[in-house]
Amino acid sequence: MRKQLKRFERCAEKSLALQEGMVKLAFFDVDLKNSKLLFEQENFDEATFADNFVVKSGEWSVEDGWVVGKNPDMCPGMIVSQKDFFGNVMVELTAKMVAPSTHDINVMINGEWDEEKDCRGYAYVAGLEAFWHGNVGFEKSPEYKLTAATPLFRFEPEKEHNFKMGNVDGKVFVLVDDELCLEISDPEPLDTSLYGKIGFEAYSSWWKFKGLKVYKLKYEKIEEYYNPEF
């Protein structure tokens, strides 16, 4: 059972926990340090890109170790993984805009590609400087009825950002530069034994990534409670 902390204690504990590889969510502790690394590719070339991804839409290339996505259209320009990563997973990458583009770095986990409709099917999707108003945001595809967004992260398009997106039993979380930006509970979680694709999307944007890692998450369910204050 996890005790309640005062605000200054809570902020300090979260910061220290992230430094030690622990993400504290409501009712879950996610142990990043001891999670299983399923995939890692620091720098890409044409061969490693082709081995690991399929281009579905948009323009995608490799430049100086970076995977570069360019799509001027008002729709997803996507690449999808060749391999499935089933279960409770997290994707980590280093991402950066390509000038003059300033928005929409988008990532998919626990997804699928609907070949019949030629579009993304079921999936969890998160975006940085996205969702129309410069938000860190989340949406559940394909109905997009479950969404969340916050404008509070201070995005710098010329800077490299560390982006993490994970899912634990329908508890989806997003960290940017080791700040927990979003935590969403899906009341009808996707079946992660069926949906295992990861993907990357340029939505009317131009950006690049490298340092890609995929983890099978280690976590512990926690009972939360408050200490009486009066």
Annotate each language-model stretch with its function:
Residues 71-139:
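Secretory/extracellular carbohydrate-interaction modules
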Residues 77-83, 149-155, 198-199:
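Beta-strand-rich interaction surfaces with strong enrichment in secreted/lumenal proteins
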Residues 140-162:
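Short, aromatic/His-centered strand-loop micro-motif at the edge of beta-sheets
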Residues 44, 91-93, 158-176:
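Short tryptophan-centered beta-strand motifs in secreted/extracellular beta-sheet-rich domains
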Residues 58-77:
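Short carbohydrate-recognition loop motifs
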